A protein has these predicted regions:
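Low-complexity, serine/threonine/proline-enriched polar segments
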Residues: 26-134
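Short, extreme N-terminal segment that most often corresponds to the first beta-strand
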Residues: 1-40, 157-168
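Alpha-helix capping and helix-coil boundary motifs
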Residues: 12-17, 61, 88, 143
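Acidic, proline/glycine-rich low-complexity IDRs
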Residues: 1-3, 125-168
Length: 168
């Protein structure tokens, strides 16, 4: 499955922003992906090659920058709504009680309750994951709050959003 994520970074220009993201992605951050293209991948004209074509500069396009982040937030909200609808609290609590009492969850071991609760927890803790859609290199966080703080403080010089097509 492919997912488009937007990485926030401070850089000199679009090329520098894409290069910084490429360096960080390749070195350390993404343990859930087996393949990626910086620059948008299948969402761009450079499907298999790293590029800076889709990079968004806050200085040049502040509304598009903020709209893109809002899109990431909406995608998270949609994912959480899907997860919420899948979680059956009674089944989950029953599994917890069985495990606490017997060391196993019994017949529910192939159910997806714990999977969805784990996904919800990962998102609520703002751990970077396939459903984050956004990552802030500057603050090492999947939270969008810090970027908005920079914008609010008028400290947005050299802010860029770099698209990354991840496969997982």
């Amino acid at each position: 499955m492919h997912t488009l994520h937007w990485w926030a970074v401070q850089a000199v220009d679009k090329e520098d922003a894409a290069a910084i993201v490429e360096s960080v992605v390749s070195e350390e951050y993404v343990d859930w992906s087996d393949w990626y293209v910086v620059g948008g991948g299948r969402w761009s004209n450079s499907q298999y090659e790293n590029s800076h074509d889709m990079v968004i500069s806050y200085d040049e396009e502040p509304e598009k920058f903020k709209e893109t982040i809002r899109g990431c937030i909406q995608a998270r909200m949609d994912e959480m709504t899907f997860i919420k609808d899948k979680i059956d609290i009674n089944k989950f609590v029953n599994s917890v009680e069985k495990y606490a009492n017997f060391g196993t969850i019994g017949d529910d071991r192939f159910g997806l309750q714990t999977y969805y609760v784990r996904k919800a927890g990962t998102m609520l803790l703002e751990y970077y994951n396939p459903d984050s859609y956004f990552y802030d290199i500057i603050h090492h966080s999947a939270s969008t709050d810090y970027i908005y703080e920079l914008i609010d403080k008028k400290d947005s010089n050299g802010l860029f959003l770099v698209p990354v097509d991840f496969h997982y």
